[in-house]
Amino acid sequence: MTWTLDSSIKAILFDKDGTLIDFDRTWSVINRKAAAIAAAGDGLLCDVLLNACGMDPLTGKTRADSMFASANADEIARHMVDHGSPVAPDALARLLDQAFVDGADAAVPICDLNLVMGRLTGSGLPLGIASSDGEASIRRTVEVLGLTRHVSFIAGYDSGHGPKPEPGMIHAFAAHLGLSASQIAMVGDNRHDLAMARAAGAGAAIGVLSGTGTHQSLTELADICIASVADLPDLLAAR
């Protein structure tokens, strides 16, 4: 039997990187900068930190469910310190957060997001974004890509709802709309997104294969996997 979205779904919550944003084209440069900051000028250590956080220094590709793929700045900073960064973890987290905000100006969308989001909001579905990035970086990305009119809710790891894969971001989005978590569909490219959906009791956990996750890594937690968010309006239209 083919799985379809239930008609009880009333809103969509998106992950950002790998879901709305082309992960490698956007983040390979940012993550190299992050590793360079953490390495404090040590080129060899920079490559060690890139590998430790999940990015191949040669190809710029990031592994599914690695630190760079799913963790927040605080978690990445502490992981980098554990792997040799001489920078104090709290100071490094602040530096990484700023690097991520700066990098938002070069965000590459995964597809025509205005078209996709316009179709979704036009059908009466409120949209939100929940990311392991900081809230300031998410807001900057939304502004740069001209998506502000489509997005009614934004949550980052530092917004007060807890980090992924805890359920708080989904619960906050539902409360913002006066809905229950079971009326929310979560869309994301890694296991943290889908685990958050399961923990929150979301109505749907939709995996996208446009980011760091694979069908193999996502299928255990996803109700369905689609190529990218470009396929979402048609999936919803079939309800």
Language-model segments: which ranges?
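Conserved phosphate-coupling serine/threonine residues in phosphotransfer and NTP-handling enzymes
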Residues: 19, 131-133
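N-terminal helical cap/lid subdomain that shapes the substrate entry/recognition surface
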Residues: 7-114, 119-122
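Asp-based, Mg2+/Mn2+-dependent phosphohydrolase catalytic module
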Residues: 1-12, 25, 40, 118-122, ...
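Residues that cap or flank secondary-structure elements
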Residues: 68, 108-109, 130, 161-162, ...
